[in-house]
UniProtKB/Swiss-Prot annotation:
First-listed, main subcellular location of the protein, grouped into a coarse class: secreted
Domain notes: The presence of a 'disulfide through disulfide knot' structurally defines this protein as a knottin.
Family classification: Belongs to the neurotoxin 10 (Hwtx-1) family. 15 (Hntx-3) subfamily.
Cellular component terms (Gene Ontology): extracellular region; host cell presynaptic membrane
Subunit architecture: Monomer.
Alphabetized InterPro entries for the sequence: Huwentoxin-1, Huwentoxin_CS1
Name the record gives this protein: Mu-theraphotoxin-Hhn2l
Residue numbers bearing the Leucine amide modification: 81
Keywords: Amidation, Disulfide bond, Ion channel impairing toxin, Knottin, Neurotoxin, Presynaptic neurotoxin, Secreted, Signal, Toxin, Voltage-gated sodium channel impairing toxin
Source species of the chain: Cyriopagopus hainanus (Chinese bird spider)
Location(s), subcellular: Secreted
Keyword Signal appears in the UniProt entry: yes
Function: Lethal neurotoxin. Selectively blocks tetrodotoxin-sensitive voltage-gated sodium channels (Nav). Does not affect tetrodotoxin-resistant voltage-gated sodium channels or calcium channels.
Amino acid sequence: MKASMFLALAGLVLLFVVGYASESEEKEFPIELLSKIFAVDVFKGEERGCKGFGDSCTPGKNECCPDHACSNKHKWCKVYLGK
Protein backbone atom coordinates (compact mmCIF):
# COMPACT_ATOMS: atom_id res chain seq x y z
CA MET A 1 0.00 0.00 0.00
CA LYS A 2 2.79 2.43 0.93
CA ALA A 3 4.82 1.44 -2.11
CA SER A 4 1.93 2.05 -4.50
CA MET A 5 1.28 5.47 -2.96
CA PHE A 6 4.97 6.32 -3.28
CA LEU A 7 5.02 5.22 -6.92
CA ALA A 8 1.91 7.28 -7.67
CA LEU A 9 3.48 10.35 -6.08
CA ALA A 10 6.77 9.75 -7.92
CA GLY A 11 4.82 9.45 -11.18
CA LEU A 12 3.07 12.76 -10.57
CA VAL A 13 6.39 14.46 -9.81
CA LEU A 14 7.91 12.97 -12.96
CA LEU A 15 4.93 14.16 -14.99
CA PHE A 16 5.36 17.67 -13.57
CA VAL A 17 9.09 17.71 -14.39
CA VAL A 18 8.54 16.46 -17.94
CA GLY A 19 5.78 19.02 -18.51
CA TYR A 20 7.95 21.81 -17.18
CA ALA A 21 10.92 20.64 -19.27
CA SER A 22 8.89 20.64 -22.46
CA GLU A 23 7.90 24.27 -21.86
CA SER A 24 11.40 25.37 -20.86
CA GLU A 25 13.72 26.45 -23.65
CA GLU A 26 16.67 27.38 -21.45
CA LYS A 27 19.80 25.24 -21.30
CA GLU A 28 20.16 25.58 -17.52
CA PHE A 29 16.90 23.77 -16.81
CA PRO A 30 18.15 21.25 -14.18
CA ILE A 31 19.97 23.92 -12.19
CA GLU A 32 17.03 26.30 -12.45
CA LEU A 33 14.57 23.63 -11.34
CA LEU A 34 16.68 22.54 -8.38
CA SER A 35 17.27 26.10 -7.25
CA LYS A 36 13.51 26.74 -7.41
CA ILE A 37 12.74 23.57 -5.47
CA PHE A 38 15.31 24.11 -2.73
CA ALA A 39 15.35 27.94 -2.91
CA VAL A 40 19.10 27.83 -2.40
CA ASP A 41 21.60 29.56 -4.62
CA VAL A 42 24.29 26.91 -4.28
CA PHE A 43 25.00 26.52 -7.98
CA LYS A 44 26.45 29.98 -8.53
CA GLY A 45 29.49 29.69 -6.27
CA GLU A 46 31.73 31.52 -8.74
CA GLU A 47 29.83 34.77 -8.23
CA ARG A 48 30.45 35.03 -4.49
CA GLY A 49 33.44 35.00 -2.18
CA CYS A 50 32.11 32.40 0.25
CA LYS A 51 32.03 28.63 -0.09
CA GLY A 52 28.74 26.83 -0.66
CA PHE A 53 27.39 23.39 0.17
CA GLY A 54 29.95 20.60 -0.25
CA ASP A 55 32.98 22.87 -0.71
CA SER A 56 36.05 21.99 1.36
CA CYS A 57 36.81 24.29 4.28
CA THR A 58 39.00 24.68 7.34
CA PRO A 59 37.18 24.52 10.70
CA GLY A 60 37.58 27.71 12.71
CA LYS A 61 37.85 29.97 9.68
CA ASN A 62 34.77 31.77 8.39
CA GLU A 63 34.98 30.49 4.79
CA CYS A 64 31.45 29.17 4.32
CA CYS A 65 28.48 31.30 3.28
CA PRO A 66 26.29 32.77 6.07
CA ASP A 67 23.67 30.00 5.84
CA HIS A 68 26.36 27.27 5.95
CA ALA A 69 28.85 26.07 8.58
CA CYS A 70 32.13 24.18 8.30
CA SER A 71 31.85 20.63 9.63
CA ASN A 72 34.62 19.70 12.08
CA LYS A 73 34.20 16.02 11.25
CA HIS A 74 34.05 16.09 7.43
CA LYS A 75 35.76 19.46 6.75
CA TRP A 76 33.23 20.68 4.18
CA CYS A 77 30.48 23.29 4.27
CA LYS A 78 27.06 22.05 5.40
CA VAL A 79 23.74 23.84 5.73
CA TYR A 80 23.60 25.37 9.22
CA LEU A 81 20.45 24.27 11.06
CA GLY A 82 21.11 26.27 14.23
CA LYS A 83 21.76 23.34 16.56
